[in-house]
């Protein structure tokens, strides 16, 4: 039995398909979804979504958002979604270093600090993908 997955951004449905197991980055850590999962609503963080179908593994880098889980599906509403295959590790490393340098000179609780922290989180997710 499979789990139907939808990853939706403000611009479009970035991915739709079925898998045996989906893992998503929750606020309290990664959570997995198998068929017959309990109904759940969760806040998600920037990170890596992993979809497993048999021996095939597909990964996406996603921004923060929400997950709605049902017995046979998961819908992720996120602000961005990129295929892990499209990630340029050198660019992600540069973005992470720039974000960390910027964080040293700003109030991390300010709006600017939170924006920079989000950039750092996305760069880290790209490097993990």
Task: Describe each model-derived feature in a short phrase.
Residues 1-4:
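N-terminal export/targeting signal detector
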Residues 81-129:
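Acidic/glycine-rich phosphate/pyrophosphate-binding loops and surrounding catalytic core
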């Amino acid at each position: 039995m499979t789990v139907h997955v939808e990853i939706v951004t403000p611009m479009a449905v970035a991915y739709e398909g079925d898998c045996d197991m989906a893992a998503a980055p929750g606020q309290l850590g990664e959570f997995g979804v198998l068929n017959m999962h309990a109904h759940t609503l969760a806040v998600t963080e920037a990170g890596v979504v992993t979809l497993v179908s048999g021996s095939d593994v597909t990964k996406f880098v996603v921004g923060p958002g929400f997950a709605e889980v049902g017995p046979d599906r998961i819908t992720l509403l996120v602000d961005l979604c990129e295929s892990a295959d499209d990630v340029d590790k050198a660019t992600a490393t540069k973005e992470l270093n720039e974000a960390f340098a910027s964080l040293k000179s700003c109030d991390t609780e300010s709006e600017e600090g939170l924006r920079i922290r989000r950039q750092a989180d996305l760069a880290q997710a790209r490097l993990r993908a």
